Amino acid sequence: MIPDYLTFIRFQDKRNLIYIYAIGLILIGFYWKNAGFTFPSEDIGVVSGILALVLYNFIFDLKAYWAYKCVTKNIDFSWFKKKQNHKIELFLTQPLVAGFLSLIMLSAMSWGLYQLLPSLYALFLISLLGPLVIFLLFRMIRTSYVKQVAISVAKKVKYKSLTRYVLLSVCISTVVNLLTISPLRNSDSFVTEGQWLTFKSIIALLILCGVVLAINLFFLRFSKRYAFLGRLFLQEIDLFFSSENALSTFFAKPLWLRLFILLVIEVMWITLVSVLATLVEWRIWFEAYFLLCYVPCLIYYFFYCRFLWHNDFMMACDMYFRWGHFNK
C-alpha cells in the first residue's frame, strides 16, 4: 500500500527540519567563530544571505525530485486533485526569485531583531528563527512544485551539459564560502595587507582553504541520482547530458594520495601568489585574495563534484531505461 502525500511529507518533514537547522546552524556557527564571536550591524546582510542560499540549495532540485516521485507513482497524490497553478505562483516559486524574496524577508527580520536586542541575543534568535522561516517557505514551495510537475515538461533542454550544471552549483557554494569567511578580514591572522609573504599568513590561508574544502566535500555525500532522474522525466536534461567522466583515472587513486598531491600544489600556489602580491604591493579585499589562493582547491572540488555527479547521472539513466522498459 502506497502512502498518501500528506502522510509521506509528515514523515519527511521531520528530517527536512533537522537538515535545515543543522546546515543553517553550522554555517552561522562558522560565521560567528570567524567574526570573533561578535555580530556587527554591517553583517546583517551576510547572515541573511547565508540563510537565503540555504533555501536556494534546498529548492534547486526540488521540482525534479517530486517529478521522479510523481512519475514512479510510489505516493498517492489524490490530495492535489482540482488544485490549480496560478501565474504569480509559478513566478514566485522559481529558485532565484524565491531565494531573493527570502533574502529580503530574512534581512528585515534580522534588522528588526538587531534593533530590539543586543547583537549576540539578536544573532541567537536569528539562528533559531531563520531556519524555521526557511522550512516554512520550503513547505509552501514544495506544494507549488508538486502542482507544477504536470505542466512543467520543458520545451527544450534546460541544462545542455553536466559541466554547466556543476559550474552553477560550485558558484553558489563559493558565494556561501565567501560570506562565511568574510569576517576574517578583521582577524589578526589575516590582516596581511602589504605583508602577504609571511609564514603566519601562508599557514593560516592553507588551513582556511583546507577547512572550506572539507566542508564542501562533506555536502557532496548527498546523491543527485533522483534529481537527475526527475530532470530526465521533465526533459530538462537529455541522455547526452554527460558523455564522459573527466579525470576518472585521478579520482580512482586513494583519497590520501589525492589530498597529498593537492596539499603540495596548494602550498606552492599560495607561496607563489604571496610572492607576487608582495612584489606588486597589491591592495585587494581579503575575500578576493582568499579566492585567488583557493583556486587549486576550487578546481579539485569542481572536478570531484563532476566525477560524482556523472556517476549519479549514469545511475539515473539506468533507472530511466528500466522504468521505460517496465511501462511498455
Swiss-Prot record:
Report the membrane topology from the UniProt record. Multi-pass membrane protein
Instruction: Kindly state which keywords UniProt assigns to this record, in alphabetical order.
Output: Cell membrane, Membrane, Transmembrane, Transmembrane helix
Cellular component terms per the entry's GO annotation: plasma membrane
In terms of superkingdom, the source organism counts as: Bacteria
The record's subcellular locations are:
Cell membrane
Task: Reply yes or no: does the keyword Lipid metabolism apply.
Answer: no
Assign the protein's first listed, main location to one coarse class.
membrane
Transmembrane segments in this chain: where? 17-37, 44-64, 96-116, 118-138, 165-185, 202-222, 260-280, 284-304
Q: What is this protein called?
A: Uncharacterized protein YcdU
Q: Provide the species name.
A: Escherichia coli (strain K12)
